[in-house]
From Swiss-Prot:
Residue sites binding a 1,2-diacyl-sn-glycero-3-phospho-(1D-myo-inositol-3-phosphate) per the record: 288, 313-314, 376-381, 421
Disordered: annotated segments: 1-32, 580-603
Species name: Bos taurus
Ranges of compositional bias, category Polar residues: 1-13
Pfam family, one: Myotub-related
Active site per UniProt: 375 (phosphocysteine intermediate)
Name assigned to this protein: Myotubularin
PROSITE patterns on file: PPASE_MYOTUBULARIN (PS51339), TYR_PHOSPHATASE_1 (PS00383), TYR_PHOSPHATASE_2 (PS50056)
Amino-acid positions noted as binding a 1,2-diacyl-sn-glycero-3-phospho-(1D-myo-inositol-3,5-bisphosphate) in the UniProt annotation, renumbered to this chain: 288, 313-314, 376-381, 417, 421
Amino acid sequence: MASAPTSKYNSHSLENESIKRTSRDGVNRDVGETLPRLPGEIRITDKEVIYICPFNGPIKGRVYITNYRLYLRSLETDSALILDVPLGVISRIEKMGGATSRGENSYGLDITCKDLRNLRFALKQEGHSRRDMFEILTRYAFPLAHSLPIFAFLNEEKFNVDGWTVYNPVEEYRRQGLPNHHWRITFINKCYKLCDTYPALLVVPYRASDEDLRRVATFRSRNRIPVLSWIHPENKTVIVRCSQPLVGMSGKRNKEDERYLDVIRETNRQVNKLTIYDARPNVNAVANKATGGGYESDDVYHNAELFFLDIHNIHVMRESLKKVKDIVYPNVEESHWLSSLESTHWLEHIKLVLTGAIQVADRVSSGKSSVVVHCSDGWDRTAQLTSLAMLMLDSFYRSIEGFEILVQKEWISFGHKFASRIGHGDKNHADADRSPIFLQFIDCVWQMSKQFPTAFEFNERFLITILDHLYSCRFGTFLYNCESAREKQKVTERTVSLWSLINSNKDKFKNPFYTKEINRVLYPVASMRHLELWVNYYIRWNPRIKQQQPNPVEQRYMELLALRDEYIKRLDELQLANSAKLSDPSASPSSPSQMMPHVQTHF
């Protein structure tokens, strides 16, 4: 990692950077063109502060606080700096120093962010400036604690594409060839009474009645019964997801659950066994028996094979990411980098998640066996495994729209607890439910995109933009824990979808090397020597670390694509003009060669 001198430090997301460049298109500015504002964004206050920059030292600036962001612009001519931080990114706000503090810049605020950076501001001790800033930031960064709406409900942005229409479950299952004579669509969960964390529409075995489903639900954690996620277009094997069975210490059984899994097995008669992947380490699954959970024993589920994938729980992942932050922010120790990275175990966890997904995909595609995937409750590791396996198996999900559908389906509609894992608008930064499960998934996708650079329609900016708005609270896409809660809060009616932003600006998020391929299965190499830390995400706030610059070939290719599009547009305009003249009898006849100048597209 090479160091680079820097005279200008812009600490904001890629997406926010694009806002500044296109501020004439819907982003208001006030206070002498210093503050960008979204429609619905209101300026609350501004103060002069000293920003304790961990890279360039103390910098005098003015900080503006709105109901959406903290925005700082330096007042020093020799140090141009901008900080643009959505308040949803803030995890914790602490006061530093006391009334008797005498050290230089020792009195102010410490701000911890969810996107791996910290901010420190020094303020004057007189005039209650710290108290005022602390109270305002706390009020708008943690609106739920103050009976205020999350900004997404105040955002008045308009886009020419409605992102809420991207995912229609009926259309997505129809794309997969469902329903068929083995699988049916049921609306038994229409009012979320069968399972309050599942979507309203489910795909289940044709031979299983709704009453069977109710009986199975009593034996699955949180009533999360086995339901279909994906079906192979050729061999008709399926990926089914669910939660753990409620076996308990006494080894309870449920005949309906056993028969139900057998029915799933019989929808595909190419193999005699149903494969069950339990995402947990074996010891954890056994320990869960003490709290009423457990796993499918071979002694009971005779026609099933059980494999444990050794992926650790949310608490282990949270601690691992904390260690990553410790080694990447604010400074990177070059001399001990490899050992420091290894000590975080982050890439080990990425490896285990990818390895598990590869096993699922391979068993379905090559092994021709249907698989059931679960962890404890089926909304964390299960979502990682099913969505990554589907990404490997189905090229549709590797397009921009397909990936959006994958996230909407496997993560959002099936109840990954975004509110609990991220803590949108919640001041309880130490909540044990916080965990970077979705970040891990996106990291795995990035690892795949590095190994298969032509297989994905989207680029790195697309993935980083998704992660930025996982925290920002600008859009309603990731709010709440489940579909029933979103319906209750009318999220699709009252907020804007992140996919509206992305699909209105698709060219920014396209991979120029994308080659569309049908039915190509991707098997990434999940060994430690093929995995790497995502520098452009985890270390992007450090201006001394040289970021991975766009490939010159990629830049030239993008220029040629833009040139081609311009030529095609001109050609269409000329053809339209020619048609109009041909249809006008009063117009003088012109030969095609006169009307159509020679256009060469370089392709």
